[in-house]
Each structure stands twice: as structure tokens, then as C-alpha cells.
Amino acid sequence: MCMIYNTSEIHFQQATTLTPEQFVAGLTDFGSGRSNLFGNSTDEYLNVYHLGSFEADVTEGSHGIWERLHYDWSVPNHVALTTTDSNVWGGLSGYTYTFTHQPNGTTHIDVFIVREGKNFKGRLLGLVLRTIGKGVLRRVFENSVQAIEARNLAKLSKVDLLVSKSAEKSS
């Protein structure tokens, strides 16, 4: 009998120019176009059941894999995503993001991902994640950080433009 170990634990770290609040704002933006920030979350699967000030219950996914997640960002510099339902993940599956302000003004993001397969497909995906899939997930994470940074810069540019136009009208 062949057994596939069903839990994968993956850990990434990255520095960003974003503040923790800016990253959390991107992470918890469940509007259309979420896939522009998170490649593994398409509008087709996105369903927001509850969105509060510091928590949300959301289903998201892509390519035939979905999960319902409980987002909790009530603790400063920390966001926990707990899988409450999925077609492949169960058990202790989820994500934990921890943010640390750096003296140079950047933020250190530490993300810990747990994937516990609840069926054969989930266990097989977990095996892939532990081996060749870790690099893919790292790139997806890095792309998300870069997309949120770009979105933040675009917002700042719009604010600068509005302030500039307002100053011109006042003169």
C-alpha cells in the first residue's frame, strides 16, 4: 500500500516597501479583479459571505481548486487565514502572515502555509507542493507582493495628482 503524507508546511519571507496596513488592505480587498493581486484567486470562485472590520469569510480559488477561508486581521501585524471548507484541503490548512517594521522603513513579511490534503487529490497536491510546487507558490507570493506595491504606488500617484490639481485651482 502506498501512503502519501498529507500535510505540507511552507514558509516564505520577503521585504516590501508596503506598510503592514497597506499589505493587509490588499490581502483583504475582495472586490472584482482580485486575481490581479492574487493569481490563485479568480472572480469565478470568489464569494464573500461576511466582511467585517477585522474578519471575513470568503470562498476563493482557481483551476478547479477552491477553499472557504476565515480571514482574521484583528491582531496588529498578524493575519490568520483558516480553511473552513475546501474540495481538496482540510484539517489544519491555512495561512499565517506576520509583519515586522524594519528600521529602514520597509516591512518584513513572514508567511507560513499549511496544506493538509483531505482526499487523494489533496494529498497528491500536498506532495507536489512539498517538492516542485514550493517554487511556484513562492513566485505567486512574490507576484502578489509586487502587485500590491504597484497598486499602492498607483493610488499614491492619483492622490498626488489630485493634490496638485487642487493646489493649481487655489492659486
Task: Please give the residue ranges for each predicted region.
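Hydrophobic ligand-binding cavity/cleft-lining segments
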Residues: 1-53, 171
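Short, surface-exposed coil-to-beta transition loops
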Residues: 7-11, 64-69, 90-96
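Short structured motifs
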Residues: 9-10, 54-55, 80-82, 93-98
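A short, structured loop/turn motif at beta-sheet edges
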Residues: 16-21, 51, 72-76, 98-108
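Hydrophobic pocket/interface hotspot
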Residues: 23-27, 71, 81, 109-111, ...
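Glycine-rich portal/gate segments that line the openings of hydrophobic small-molecule binding cavities
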Residues: 35, 42-88, 143, 147, ...
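Beta-strand/loop substructures that line and gate deep hydrophobic ligand-binding cavities in soluble
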Residues: 84-142
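Charge-rich (especially acidic), low-complexity segments
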Residues: 156-171
